[in-house]
């Protein structure tokens, strides 16, 4: 089976370890083990005591009861624990969910631009994939009327990313309700990758799981919860889809493992402290980035809506990938070129790095851009 490379992952696999100033990532500045230990005010005693009781075997295949209980708290409706399945990050959740639903010849609508697996996996499985575009002239938002035109009586799946990667667009509860109404009219599933939880205007945000009965939602502790090292995600779906996913999980991961499950559970148990920390990073760093952009005549963006991923447009006479390679080689600064998201003439800016990395990365990026004016 041939499948396209994921442009952003291929880029990071090659270049991220060469960076001195990494402002490409979309995780909110990753927690150190020291910061994690401090969450329980007992130097991590509750985490280590849990591990001390456990044998280092496979553990709970689908995720421990404690893990599932913490995940269930993230949704407004009551979620059956049997419908929460632990996965290898959100990437694994998306893979298993799409494989469980999509068959050759199916019609799939995918938000675009977005994280490539949401449209490349269905295409590789033999589906006809049409794009529902985020439009720059609409402030990088999609047009609901366009979705109505795209949907067909036999549309099987609509894939969305809320918030979107790399642009950072957040679809509010009203928009999700309209998507649900359109999907319901033809009986389509809606897969919503929710790994980027918005940290502002949260009263306007709802999970697709709380909006639509045929929603499939995916998430992880990697981005908003700053713990990608755990490699733990989850998928929430109805009984039929959950049972199909169980079969695919046996082929793709078996289990998350005792240690990873315990770490992810501990993170979710202390999510309020983590989110308080991360709001300060998101809002403070966004202000830093905005001030820098305001002083740059070659850079623009639509400011992200309280999420950790953003896209800057670059007005430069050089292909974005060549510019990013040169920026890394000459100044040690890492961005992800927009062409890796099929968005040329820009870059993903990981503005939620540590403040010192962001400030120096932007300063050096500004130096590189100034060279075009000499």
Question: Locations of the language-model features?
Answer:
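N-terminal small-domain helix-loop-helix segment of the aminotransferase-like
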Residues: 2-89, 269-270, 371-374
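PLP-dependent aminotransferase-like
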Residues: 44-45, 82, 100-160, 181
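A short helix->loop->beta-strand "cap" motif at the edges of active sites that frequently abuts
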Residues: 106, 127, 185-188, 213
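Helix C-cap/helix->beta junction micro-motif
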Residues: 125, 185-186, 296, 331, ...
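Active-site phosphate-binding strand-loop segment of PLP-dependent enzymes
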Residues: 136-203, 210
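PLP-dependent enzyme catalytic core of the Aspartate aminotransferase-like
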Residues: 148, 317, 326-335, 341-374
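Conserved core segment of the aminotransferase class I/II
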Residues: 213-283, 290-292
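Conserved glycine-rich beta-strand-loop-beta hairpin in the small C-terminal domain of fold type I
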Residues: 265, 281-290, 301-314, 345
